[in-house]
């Protein structure tokens, strides 16, 4: 069974979420014949449900939205309007104005506007230390000159073309017994449901009822906030007549750092050391995210292997809303070996005397063959394999160029 966020529309058609296009069409035709208003006058609402479900699921883009996000995905992807709002209310129990999980209507019964989403890019330093910054946004506010009416009192009239719904609904017959309900934004009122004569329109907003205004938000980035976390400003989104403003929601986007990588409340870094440091101990200093100079010491006699990881407790990220508790810092060591011929050959024996003894080489009985180790570049692949591939390509080309299908070169 397909993994989907909601199955209501599939249930209406009586098909599983993984149904194919043909299965959807077959189910729709069967139900449309059964509940068509001409055949069953009392099943008008049921027929609308069936038509709506098929319209969504037969459209690949709408179906993907619905499968991934359910009702919420359709609410986001739809422009709203009277007719569509009615069918949403009937099927899902709410209007189109419940954007991003918010209720379609507020407690006082007013419709609720859409939320405004904005990314907020934050450095790792600011997420470690916390920061207060100002963000400038442009939003719609009710026109003060006409109090959001768009014109003088009594000038606003219901659009006769769409009867005040803002959309026009059309039913198109696809085949005998198969129809599709479609809707489009009313061109006469641009989806407003209302019209104002040009001479009566407000001079300031030109009848649009709202004007653009710059809003300065003071944003508090708390210590320990994480990538994807939300900062919400309630009721600060666009204003519209008769609609309660939605929220401005900022999504924290953590910037990449040149030294540290974050994993929850832990930090990771890579530090390069030489062979002598790996064998004889070391000390190094690095600058932390709060500008402290941290000294790391490792005692002589304890060996650091290439790629090994050591941990510094309590030097990770502060916990969100509990900043005195911190994660850990993990340091991965990249041991840099000397270049070839870095030491005088006469000194190699002295160096070998200082290092642990070589393992004993077992005696091999029988014939042996000595081979040479060569440099290998993993990005270029195996040389032998390339030669074989080149040979095969050459043979194929020659075969296709000079002989018929299946004919091979004769051997002398």
UniProtKB/Swiss-Prot annotation:
Q: Which residues carry this modification: Phosphotyrosine?
A: 391
Q: What is this protein called?
A: DnaJ homolog subfamily A member 2
Domain J, residue spans: 8-70
- Could you tell me what this protein does? Co-chaperone of Hsc70. Stimulates ATP hydrolysis and the folding of unfolded proteins mediated by HSPA1A/B (in vitro).
User: Which residues are the propeptide, according to the record?
Assistant: 410-412
Q: Name one GO molecular function term.
A: protein-folding chaperone binding
Where does the record place its CXXCXGXG motif repeats? 143-150, 159-166, 186-193, 202-209
Q: Which PANTHER family match?
A: DNAJ-LIKE-2, ISOFORM A-RELATED (PTHR43888)
Q: Could you tell me which species this protein originates from?
A: Rattus norvegicus
Region annotated Disordered sits at 365-412
Phosphoserine PTM positions? 78, 123, 394-395
Q: Which gene encodes it?
A: Dnaja2
Task: Kindly give the InterPro entries that the UniProt entry links to this protein.
Answer: DnaJ, DnaJ_C, DnaJ_domain, DnaJ_domain_CS, DNJA1/2-like, HSP40/DnaJ_pept-bd, HSP_DnaJ_Cys-rich_dom, HSP_DnaJ_Cys-rich_dom_sf
């Amino acid at each position: 069974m397909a993994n989907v966020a909601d199955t209501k529309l599939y249930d209406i058609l009586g098909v599983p979420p993984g149904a194919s296009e043909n299965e959807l069409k077959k189910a729709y035709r069967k139900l449309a014949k059964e509940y068509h208003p001409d055949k069953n006058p009392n099943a008008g609402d049921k027929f609308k449900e069936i038509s709506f479900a098929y319209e969504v699921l037969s459209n690949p883009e709408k179906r993907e939205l619905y499968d991934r996000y359910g009702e919420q995905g359709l609410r986001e992807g739809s422009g709203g309007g009277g007719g569509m709002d009615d069918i949403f209310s009937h099927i899902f129990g709410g209007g189109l104005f419940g954007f991003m999980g918010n209720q379609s209507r507020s407690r006082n019964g007013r419709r609720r506007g859409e939320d405004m989403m904005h990314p907020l890019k934050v450095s790792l330093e600011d997420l470690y230390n916390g920061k207060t910054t100002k963000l400038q946004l442009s939003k719609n506010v009710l026109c003060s000159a006409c109090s959001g009416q768009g014109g003088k009192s009594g000038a606003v009239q219901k659009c006769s073309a769409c009867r005040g719904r803002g959309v026009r609904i059309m039913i198109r017959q696809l085949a005998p017994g198969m129809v599709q309900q479609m809707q489009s934004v009313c061109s006469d009122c641009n989806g407003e449901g209302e019209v104002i004569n040009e001479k009566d329109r407000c001079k300031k907003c030109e009848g649009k009822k709202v004007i653009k205004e710059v809003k300065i938000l003071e944003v508090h980035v708390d210590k320990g906030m994480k990538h994807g976390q939300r900062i919400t400003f309630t009721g600060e989104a666009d204003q519209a007549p008769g609609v309660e403003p939605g929220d401005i929601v900022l999504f924290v986007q953590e910037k990449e750092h040149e030294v540290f990588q974050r994993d929850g409340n832990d930090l990771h870094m890579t530090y390069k050391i030489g062979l002598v440091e790996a064998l004889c101990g070391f000390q190094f200093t690095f600058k932390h995210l709060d500008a402290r100079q941290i000294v790391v010491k490792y005692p002589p006699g304890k060996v650091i292997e290439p790629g090994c990881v050591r941990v510094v407790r309590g030097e990770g990220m502060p916990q969100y809303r509990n900043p005195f508790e911190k994660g850990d810092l993990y340091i991965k060591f990249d041991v840099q070996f000397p270049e070839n011929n870095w030491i005088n050959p006469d000194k190699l024996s002295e160096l070998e005397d200082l290092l642990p003894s070589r393992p004993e080489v077992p005696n091999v009985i029988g014939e042996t063959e000595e081979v040479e180790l060569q440099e290998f570049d993993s990005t270029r692949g195996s040389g032998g394999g390339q030669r074989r591939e080149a040979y095969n390509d050459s043979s194929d080309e020659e075969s296709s160029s000079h002989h018929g299908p299946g004919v091979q070169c004769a051997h002398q």
